[in-house]
Amino acid sequence: MSERKLFTSESVSEGHPDKIADQISDAILDAILAEDPEAHVAAETCVYTGSVHVFGEISTKAYIDINRVVRDTIAEIGYTEAEYGFSAESVGVHPSLVEQSGDIAQGVNEALESREGDTDDLSHIGAGDQGLMFGFAINETPELMPLPISLSHQLVRRLAELRKSGEISYLRPDAKSQVTVEYDEHDKPVRVDTVVISTQHDPEATNDQIRQDVIEKVIKAVIPADYLDDDTKFFINPTGRFVIGGPQGDSGLTGRKIIVDTYGGYSRHGGGAFSGKDATKVDRSASYAARYIAKNLVAAGLATKAEVQLAYAIGVAQPVSVRVDTFGTSTVPEAVLEAAVRQVFDLRPAGIIQMLDLKRPIYKQTAAYGHMGRTDIDLPWERLNKVDALVEAVKTVL
């Protein structure tokens, strides 16, 4: 009997409470960076019925209207009706942002290497904190992402498209998806075993109508027919009713969907969240760099699966460790890949910022539907412009 395995990942829509918080935090970050690219920002958001609290630490010359940024973001998501219990114009906005700690700033603004005499400009900025970050890529999908999280993101994005276009008029902003994929004995995806979709709706919509629309207009529009069969299970709004949703149903907080933001649990995670943080925070920038490395390694044919770990000490520019794990799929020893990575990629925070051009206001668009593997927007860490350099570096190391 051949061994089959199941793996499940989930995603949530832009109207999920935690994702509302992420988008507000990143909208504030973008607004600040648009005026002050050198700003240091750590903006956290909490949302609940009728209220938004924004708090954290910033260092900037910019002035932004936080109240307006918050309301515009909520309106763009789709919370514009008072009956939702959370609407753009009636919500209470409570900002409480303070100056970044001087003790932290001194290590970020002048790294240990710079203080010890390194005159390289890219050694001037130190890591904003200690920590470990992971990046991953696998050849299961064209975007080199695991199939379960890729499909989960596509499902909730499709729901949002149908809601915003008015094609399914009874949909409301909050939604979740979950996809279970069956793998064969060679770890290749062969079918979708289970799809779970919970979507908020107007009270007049019937369960039968929702089920039919979701299966025909969402699931079958997203998941290739080859992956669906008579044994595929569909759970559509399995509680039977989802009228109360968004912050009226659950509070939301920045940084609570870190697995949705990355690889759906298929790869390890260092624990740091992304949204609301400028690129001196290696939780964010080094995670993007690690994805960039992993994706280019796989695209170069040096492995079919690659996980990259980076780790940093606060106030120090150079990473304390770089590890490449290919799970036995690499064409050369992993030590060779690690040496090649160090040759090709400058992994100091300033090097990452320069390499990926991370001082721009590009972050709000990443705050829903995943930071990795995006095909609908142009993100620098998704580009495959280091493939040739990696191949050549491997040759020099060998």
Curated annotation (Swiss-Prot):
Q: Where does K(+) bind?
A: E44
The EC number(s) given in the record are 2.5.1.6
Q: Which InterPro entries match?
A: ADOMET_SYNTHASE_CS (IPR022631), S-AdoMet_synt_C (IPR022630), S-AdoMet_synt_central (IPR022629), S-AdoMet_synt_N (IPR022628), S-AdoMet_synthetase (IPR002133), S-AdoMet_synthetase_sfam (IPR022636)
A GO molecular function annotation here is: ATP binding
Q: Name one GO cellular component term.
A: cytoplasm
Question: Where located?
Answer: Cytoplasm
Q: In terms of domain of life, where is this protein from?
A: Bacteria
Its main localization is cytoplasm
Enumerate the SUPFAM superfamilies for this protein: S-adenosylmethionine synthetase
Q: Quick one: which pathway? A: Amino-acid biosynthesis; S-adenosyl-L-methionine biosynthesis; S-adenosyl-L-methionine from L-methionine: step 1/1
Decide whether keyword Ligase is in the record: no
| Cofactor binding: number and manner | Binds 2 divalent ions per subunit. Binds 1 potassium ion per subunit.
What are the alphabetically sorted keywords of the record?
ATP-binding, Cytoplasm, Magnesium, Metal-binding, Nucleotide-binding, One-carbon metabolism, Potassium, Transferase
Q: Which residues bind L-methionine?
A: E57, Q100, D250, K281
Quaternary structure and partners: Homotetramer; dimer of dimers.
Q: Which HAMAP family match?
A: S_AdoMet_synth1
Q: Which family does it belong to?
A: Belongs to the AdoMet synthase family.
Official protein name in the record: S-adenosylmethionine synthase
Q: Which organism is it from?
A: Streptococcus pyogenes serotype M28 (strain MGAS6180)
